Design a protein with these regions (language model features):
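Catalytic palm subdomain of template-directed nucleic-acid polymerases
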Residues: 1-24, 40-46, 76-81
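Short secondary-structure boundary/capping segments
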Residues: 18, 46-47, 52-53, 134-135, ...
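Secondary-structure transition/capping motifs at alpha-helix termini
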Residues: 21-28, 153
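Short, intrinsically disordered, charge-balanced linker/junction segments flanking boundaries
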Residues: 116, 201-204
Length: 204
């Protein structure tokens, strides 16, 4: 469950409504696993205050965090995607190491099938919009390094020639395809609210 509100008071009212609703169902929230996050404005000169009263749920104060993982995607109070990109990069290294350890002796065709399945899908990549260029460059370098290690290429081998020989998508192609697929899916989504939000974001 995610609650979004434009002000502290509105957020507290939503929490009170939720607490009353679950009380009617004779159940309760696990406040130890409930968190609150205050998103920073894009224009920091318009920030009203740097401190807010603690939000409470069932008379328990909620912990304020600067980042939180929700449905596999790391959300940051600064709305930047650097943390999520770094997380996906670490997952790529982990998956590549497993493939190298267990399937290094397989044929190239088998390796290509495995690599396409496990190392060319970056969860949430279609949502990346605000990030430091250096963070994405490190991720790109990590992707190239994983390809060279798994397929046994020398570290000084031409990256362009390697991808042409293997027929694998380059890093920028993976990101582009992810965004195109995401936009195509939400533009025909069955939920009218999702379609309206997409239309507003696409044509501000």
């Amino acid at each position: 469950l995610v609650l979004l509100a434009p002000s502290w008071l509105a957020q507290q009212k939503l929490l009170n409504i939720c607490a009353a609703a679950v009380a009617d169902l004779d159940t309760n929230f696990n406040t130890s696993k409930s968190y609150t996050m205050i998103f920073e404005p894009f224009n920091r000169t318009r920030r009203v205050t740097f401190e807010f009263p603690s939000l409470a749920l069932n008379a328990s104060q909620l912990c304020v965090v600067s980042s939180f993982m929700y449905l596999g995607h790391i959300l940051s109070a600064s709305t930047a995607d650097n943390d999520d990109i770094a997380h996906q990069m670490s997952l790529l290294y982990a998956r590549a190491n497993v493939l190298i350890r267990k399937f290094s002796k397989c044929s190239r065709n088998v390796k290509l099938c495995l690599f396409r399945t496990y190392c060319t899908n970056f969860y949430g990549a279609a949502l990346w919009k605000q990030y430091n260029a250096t963070v994405l460059k490190r991720f790109k370098a990590a992707y190239v390094k994983c390809v060279k290690m798994f397929f046994g290429y020398d570290r000084m081998y031409s990256v362009t020639a390697m991808f042409i020989e293997l027929g694998l998508p380059v890093f920028s192609t993976i990101l582009h395809n992810a965004k195109c697929s995401f936009v195509a899916s939400i533009s025909v989504h069955a939920n009218s609210v999702v379609r309206v939000v997409h239309a507003v974001c696409a044509y501000p």
